[in-house]
Amino acid sequence: MNKRTFIKRFGQLAISVPLLPNTTLGNHPKSFHTRTVSDDFWMNIRSDYDLKPDYINLESGYYNIIPRPTLEKLQGYMRMVNYEGSYYMRTVQWDNKKNTASRLAGLVNCAPDELIITRNATESLDLIITGYPWKQGDEAIMAEQDYGAMLEQFKLASKRYGINNKLVSVPNHPKSDEEIVRLYEEAITPKTKLIFVSHMINITGHILPIKKICAMAHQKGVEVLVDGAHCIGHFEVDIDDLGCDYYGTSLHKWLAAPLGAGFLYVSKSKIAKIWPLLAEHNREPDDIGRLNHTG
């Protein structure tokens, strides 16, 4: 794998290097003492980054430094949009958004008409939490370890719609996937409508068994909203295989995309039931673009 192949994993966006063990080691045993990639490879990657000498940045989970080729592409794109003005905004913009959404859908294995580009994971997840057709007395399940902003959004939904939020606590050292699945299962009641679950818990790095949680929830008629803020670009994500109803993520973290890029996946059969944040015109109820209007 050379530098250009690495960067072209998703157009001009550089996927974070934690994906490399999956591509270089295959099914072989992993060891911290085994060198799998040469120093020349890493120096080649490093040369694409402008790194501040004052410190070593180890926090890609908040904001990942953009590689130079991506930054230059972004700057050139901004100049082009400014040069073309309203002509671009009224014409080419829509095709570019559609094509980018389609490529993202290919990256995570979902249908292009089930994915919209948003500004980040928080916006994506809030669109579902606030747009869900809640009725007073409905229940939602989430974990104490979930991202604080999302827990606050559920509190707001509780005040606004009269829903009940049920908190579970994910153990730091679970004995099995089944223990975690059972944790959520035991919190379900006939009033439960939605489970909110982190694909990767940001404070521990724990990857939860989303596929198993979704299968259990669907057997009980409960939908699942997944917070994937720390997953895209960090490891391979197959949304179709996970079987979730909704999936929101940021792309400025492990995918090293510019700030202001995220996406929301909504299962085709669920699109029509979600209320948009801002009203859109000339859209069919099952058109996911209906949820993407920002003015």
Label for each model-derived stretch:
Residues 2-295:
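Pyridoxal 5′-phosphate
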